[in-house]
Amino acid sequence: MGTAGSGVFSANDLGRTATHEVGHWLNLRHIWGDDYCGNDFVDDTPEAEEANYGCFNFPHNDFNGCGSDSAGEMFMNYMDYVDDGCMNIFTYGQAERMWAAIDGPRSGLKTSKGCEAVQPLGISNNVEIK
């Protein structure tokens, strides 16, 4: 996604933004449900008041009005907005939701030829200079 000094924010240059966006493509919402204390439709992600930004030590106990428990907020989830270096998990429930997308509206992935090896074109790389 870029490097520091190339116009890319260095806290987000480890490729996790792509992971986050693929999560959306596979039917995941942000862990705060895209609303104040909203619903992400996944039972094993704790309720969150809003997005987290930056990077924290676990547990990050910024308790909010949504019912976060003593385990702290799930800031390290790919579907939050923390720095790339702090994102590292999808929950089992999120994985189930993504598999449901692959078995449903994204089922074409299973028969796609996009993962097959590319066949050589039979073009010669020999160049003659005169």
Give, region by region, the residue ranges found by the protein language model.
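Extracellular (secreted or membrane-anchored) zinc-dependent metallopeptidases
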Residues: 1-21, 25-129
